Design a protein with these regions (language model features):
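Surface loop/turn motifs at the tips and blade-to-blade linkers of beta-strand repeat domains
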Residues: 35-43, 87-92, 129-133, 172-178, ...
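Repeated scaffold domains used in trafficking and secretory/extracellular systems
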Residues: 41-51, 93-101, 134-142, 179-186, ...
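Conserved beta-propeller blade signature
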Residues: 59-63, 107-110, 147-150, 194-197, ...
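Short, conserved, GDST-rich strand-edge loop motifs in beta-rich repeat architectures
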Residues: 65, 434-444, 484-500
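Residue-level signature of beta-propeller blades and closely related beta-rich strand-turn architectures
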Residues: 65-66, 114, 154, 200-201, ...
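A short loop-to-beta-strand structural motif that recurs across blades of beta-propeller domains
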Residues: 72-74, 115-117, 157-159, 204-206, ...
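Short loop/turn segments that connect beta-strands within beta-propeller blades
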Residues: 78-81, 120-124, 162-166, 209-213, ...
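Blade-level signature of beta-propeller repeat domains, shared across WD40, Kelch, NHL, RCC1
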Residues: 609-638
């Protein structure tokens, strides 16, 4: 997703958090809306560090993240389990750490929500906060003078803080590209020059002279390729880097703002150790040598082991959470309402008749869900994977190489699809079609066809469909064709190349596009599509705010109007079709019904909370998500 999508989504999460409140049990509002509660009532971490407080007690610092964003830093006493939450001391707007560092002076630093922040565990307090240019650090390091450096997404912002003097320098955005940049590594040589490596559309390594603010490239334009560059600080005082991380050889020695090609990495180029990392940072070792064996935020359990004695100690801790945001909602063949959350990655099953929840750690992020026959299918991020779940059998969890797992791993489609936006369960009962945007730094997404009878896949690339486009929405037509709606958005960190989105018709048998056209001028995304059996027309939303009606026979728009924004998620599910063929629309703040003759959007109700993900029908109700909560709406009689 591009920067505009991310910024809007982070703001929206903050609004949803305020509307939903905490982990509310099932409750009804005015007889129409029911809040069924939180799908996954726990948080995930965005960095964990084992360290000590001012009394030399072992403590654990955990950045807590739920559907609101990174809302607090949790401090756990490793001996007693006693915990304390320190609310994030600035308006984070749904953002979260993507990098943190514990300095040599035992201070925890991060940079997110356009704020650089320091936490001092000896004082048990946030001790420095400074607003910066947007937005969040993708890498952080410490130089030989104890200065903390950060490099931020999406426009290569560089910031530095000297804890000894209190001086903070925001160098601003120091490198421009027309795509969102991920500076995933940063290093400083012993001469004080700062080097940072970016990706994904075109890798690069740049150097900053902190004395003058000068920024200069370390590799030629001809050496820049799709992927992520890499730099690290060595114990010999120099920095080493690669134009593309992981390549054999091709190393550069970087020193005093110059680059020298050295081929293989020199034997004396040993990485200098820092307690730093991405959002997955998990530093397990305490200063006294004890180690974290387990930290489980779902079970609220901490296990610490002593390698010297082999003994371990288990303590329970607690914290507040509003739960992970729901990515997808659909009705399963067993009559339950199911979907997935992120973050953390959990699958949920809700039985409305018994008012009972089941929750399972799941494989990846469930962007798109759909049922076909007696199975429930999942299209997920990362890798554009496809899962098959039998809800009538015991849940075992997913292992890629286990054909008996439930859910069962079927296949994946990276790099052509990395982040799914549509999973079409075709009415033929055997075909599944997955669509979405491609891998990081790529432009143009494919289509994955899965044949359940033969258990085989066909993967089309964007060049087989529409070059530089990705498919955002799909609907099956009765003549053996698919109508697809594209997005011009590239894969995360990629470059947008198509000028406007298009509709296309694809013949399923031949897998060939037989027609395409940018039918609505200037549109960047066809958010969702729905076929109405009553009139043979297709309803759609373009850029979330333009409702249109398309005639697949004449290939023309027969109606269009501007509306309030429709509900939105990576797999939107804006339209909900009832068994009697009535078609409903989920807007962010209301629910409407489409008149099949006049195409009027008849308002049914204003929603008490924002709708963040659709949407399915069960027993006279429409189920949808608002942040971390599952809601439903009782449909009035026609």
């Amino acid at each position: 997703m591009g920067m505009g999508y991310l910024a809007g989504w982070l703001w929206f999460l903050a609004v949803v958090a305020m509307a939903n409140g905490g982990g509310t049990p099932t409750s009804s509002i005015n007889g129409l809306f029911t809040n069924h509660g939180v799908a996954a009532p726990f948080s995930t971490h965005r960095g964990i560090v084992a360290t000590q407080d001012g009394q030399k007690r072992n403590i654990v610092l955990v950045w807590l993240y739920d559907h609101r964003g990174c809302y607090a830093l949790l401090l756990i006493d490793a001996e007693t389990g006693k915990s304390e939450e320190f609310p994030t001391p600035f308006p984070y707007g749904g953002d979260a750490p993507y990098a943190s560092i514990l300095s040599s002076n035992n201070r925890l630093y991060s940079h997110f929500g356009s704020h650089f922040v320091e936490f001092d565990p000896t004082k048990r307090a946030f001790t420095f906060i400074r607003k910066t240019v947007p937005q969040m650090a993708m890498s952080m390091t410490e130089d030989d003078n104890g200065v903390i450096w950060s490099a931020t997404y999406p426009q290569c912002g560089i910031a530095a803080y000297n804890p000894k003097t209190g001086e903070f320098r925001d160098f601003g955005h120091v490198h421009k590209e027309n795509w969102a940049q991920y500076p995933r590594s940063i290093a400083v040589d012993d001469a004080g020059w700062v080097y940072f490596a970016i990706g994904y559309t075109r890798s690069h390594i740049l150097a900053l002279n902190p004395k003058t603010g000068e920024v200069k490239p370390m590799i030629d334009e001809s050496e820049r390729r799709q992927g992520m560059a890499y730099v690290f600080r060595a114990t010999n005082g120099k920095v080493y880097g690669q134009p593309v991380a992981g390549e054999k050889g091709n190393w550069l020695e970087l020193y005093k703002g110059t680059a020298r090609k050295v081929g293989e990495l020199p034997p004396n180029a040993k990485p200098k150790t820092f307690i730093a990392g991405s959002q997955a940072l998990f530093h397990r070792t305490f200063p006294d040598g004890k180690r974290i064996r387990t930290l489980d935020l779902a079970e609220r359990v901490l296990v610490v082991e002593d390698p010297k004695t082999g003994e371990s100690k288990t303590v329970r801790f607690d914290y507040k959470s509003e739960g992970g945001h729901i990515m997808s909602v659909a009705v399963a063949p067993d009559g339950s309402v199911c979907g997935g959350t992120a973050f953390p990655f959990y699958a949920f099953r809700y039985d409305p008749k018994a008012d009972r929840w089941e929750r399972y750690p799941c494989y990846g992020q469930w962007n798109t869900v759909a049922k076909q026959g007696d199975r429930f299918f999942v299209g997920g991020y990362t890798g554009g994977f496809l899962l098959e779940w039998n809800p009538f059998a015991a849940w075992t969890g997913t292992t890629k190489d286990n054909p008996n797992a439930n859910p069962r791993y079927l296949t994946e489609s990276e790099p052509d699809i990395n982040r799914p936006h549509e999973l079409l369960a075709h009415p033929d009962g055997k075909t599944l079609v997955l669509a979405g945007t491609p891998a990081y730094g790529f432009t143009g997404g494919g289509l994955l066809f899965w044949d359940r009878q033969t258990q085989t896949k066909t993967l089309l690339r964007h060049t087989d469909i529409l070059q530089w486009h990705s498919t955002m929405s799909l609907v099956a037509l009765p003549d053996g064709k698919l109508l697809g709606g594209t997005t011009t958005a590239a894969g995360t960190g990629g470059e947008r190349k198509a000028k406007q989105a298009e509709l296309y018709l694809l013949d399923i048998a031949s897998k060939k596009v037989v027609w395409h056209e940018p039918i609505l001028t200037g549109v960047q995304e066809y958010t969702d599509l729905c076929y109405d059996e009553r009139n043979g027309l297709v309803y759609g939303f373009a850029d979330r705010r333009r409702f249109f009606v398309f005639d697949p026979k004449t290939k023309r728009i027969v109606h269009q109007q501007e509306t309030e924004p429709c509900a939105y998620q990576q797999g939107p599910r804006v339209f909900v079709v009832a068994p009697d063929k009535r078609v409903f629309v989920l807007f962010v703040r209301s629910i409407a019904e489409v008149d099949p003759k006049t195409f009027a959007l008849r308002p049914l109700a204003k929603t008490p909370v924002p709708i963040t993900a659709g949407g399915d029908y069960l027993d006279g109700r429409i189920y949808f998500a608002s942040g971390s909560h599952l809601w439903s709406f009782r449909i009035p009689s026609p």
